[in-house]
């Protein structure tokens, strides 16, 4: 990893190494070691806020073309009292990434780092646009695009938030990534986290059936499952959560945060936000978090968090 960051490895060899890493599932220890090096390469421009921070960044790549669920979740959780440091990027595929939809909604992705961090105490949420915080990786971007496949760096994205959040909800699109990602979070010292793989292959908790969870607390990992109908939420097919182009996804994001979305869009955000509220200690259980999240959307409080962040980054 240090060789890549220092550009000491030839591009041809880099491509071969990335392809080799893709051929095996990395262990939690390997992911944690690589993430630790990347974290050291992106020092903060100033002191870290003395707040308990939570991130909602997942691996993406589930191919389901849902709307930007975890992005909406960030603002809903903030409206419920969590301090959310959302780490994200543009989409590397044909789908719409968190940065794409937030930029379309008016968020300034190029705000200076002190301004981005400084938004947290007032807005309760901020967005760290990954390319601006990881300049050492810029040189690898053309090679990664040229390979045309997902690489280990897609897994590292959720592990290298520069603010090193205390808590996290991390969605994975493959069930085999549940344990490695949970182990990596534990090794990196995250206080409490949820790694989730949704029914139907989603990298979010799903309304279509049970979601598989790994709960990380104080360095230990345990398995659990989440069933939406037991939390008072209506089951819904994947088709009810599908997004579209950036304009469509922006419209859905705004509708969700303003309390005027469809019931499945609202409920899947509430389900995932409840996981965040539990991880951040803002709800005693996931079940307790669901009504808090629903109220934040219905009242427009989640939209006001978005407006506060948009104004803070002008």
Model-derived regions, located:
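N-terminal glycine-rich anion-binding loops that anchor highly charged ligand groups
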Residues: 1-32, 39-48, 268
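Glycine-rich anion-binding loops and their surrounding alpha/beta cores
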Residues: 40-43, 47, 66, 81, ...
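Short glycine/serine/threonine-rich phosphate/pyrophosphate-binding segments
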Residues: 62-74, 87, 93-96, 137, ...
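Active-site-proximal loop->helix
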Residues: 91-107
């Amino acid at each position: 990893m240090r060789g890549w960051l220092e550009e000491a490895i030839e591009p041809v060899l880099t491509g071969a190494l990335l392809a080799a890493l893709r051929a095996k599932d990395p262990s939690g220890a390997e992911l944690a070691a690589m993430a630790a090096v990347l974290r050291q390469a992106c020092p903060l421009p100033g002191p870290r806020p003395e707040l308990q921070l939570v991130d909602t960044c997942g691996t993406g790549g589930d191919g389901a073309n849902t709307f930007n669920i975890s992005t909406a979740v960030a603002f809903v959780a903030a409206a419920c009292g969590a301090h959310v440091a959302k780490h994200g990027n543009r989409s590397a595929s044909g789908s719409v990434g968190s940065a794409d939809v937030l930029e379309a909604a008016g968020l300034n992705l190029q705000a200076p780092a002190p301004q981005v961090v400084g938004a947290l105490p007032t807005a309760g949420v901020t967005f760290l646009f990954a390319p601006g915080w990881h300049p050492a990786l810029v040189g690898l971007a053309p090679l990664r695009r040229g390979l045309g496949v997902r690489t280990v760096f897609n897994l590292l994205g959720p592990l290298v938030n520069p603010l090193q959040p205390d808590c996290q909800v991390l969605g994975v699109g493959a069930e085999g990534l549940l344990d490695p990602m949970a182990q990596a979070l534990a090794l990196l010292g995250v206080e409490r986290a949820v790694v989730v793989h949704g029914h139907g292959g989603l990298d979010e908790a799903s309304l279509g059936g049970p979601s598989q969870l790994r709960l990380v607390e104080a360095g230990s990992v345990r398995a659990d499952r989440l069933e939406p109908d037991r939390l008072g939420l209506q089951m819904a097919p994947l088709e009810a959560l599908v997004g579209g182009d950036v304009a469509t996804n922006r419209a859905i994001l705004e509708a969700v945060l303003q309390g005027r979305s469809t019931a499945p869009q609202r409920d899947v955000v509430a389900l995932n936000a409840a996981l965040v509220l539990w991880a951040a200690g803002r709800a005693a259980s996931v079940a307790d978090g669901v009504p808090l999240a629903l109220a934040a959307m219905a009242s427009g409080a989640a939209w006001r968090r978005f407006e506060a962040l948009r104004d803070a980054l002008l």
